[in-house]
A protein has these predicted regions:
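Generic alpha-helix detector with strongest preference for long hydrophobic helices that associate
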Residues: 2, 17, 27, 64-66, ...
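Short, charged helix-to-loop "capping" segments that act as catalytic/coupling loops
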Residues: 12-17, 56-62
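N-terminal strand-loop-strand
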Residues: 1-31
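Unchanged
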Residues: 34-61, 67-116
């Protein structure tokens, strides 16, 4: 089975920070991402998942191609994750209950944090 996910490297341009979401279930930080729904493009899924998890509006930077990671999940599933570079455009009115706590981290400090 192939799983497709999409998300954003959500950037605050003026402060040169990137958003990370805290996941209680795993006790770690991650970039906002999730499953691509049927009939949805990778870009649409990335914007939706970012809004759901952060309550922020993501504007994809079209000049950059998405970063694509292929990996095997712990259950042995083949997963492709499409990560887009995006600018934070402010608060979203998304009412999804999947919202996580977010932190804004300077680019050079991202790898000092427990990431998955």
């Amino acid at each position: 089975m192939i799983i497709e996910k999409a998300g954003c490297f959500l950037i605050r341009k003026e402060t040169k920070e990137i958003a990370l979401v805290y996941r209680d279930k795993y006790n770690d930080y991650s970039f906002p991402k999730g499953h691509v729904e049927e009939g949805e493009s990778f870009k649409e899924a990335a914007i939706r998942e970012t809004a759901e998890e952060t309550k922020r509006i993501a504007q994809i930077i079209d000049e950059y191609k998405p970063f694509v990671e292929n990996y095997t999940t712990p259950r042995g599933e083949n997963c492709f994750c499409y990560m887009f570079f995006a600018i934070d455009k402010g608060k979203s009115d998304n009412q999804c209950e999947d919202t996580h706590d977010i932190i804004w981290t300077p680019f050079d400090k991202v790898y000092d944090i427990s990431l998955v």
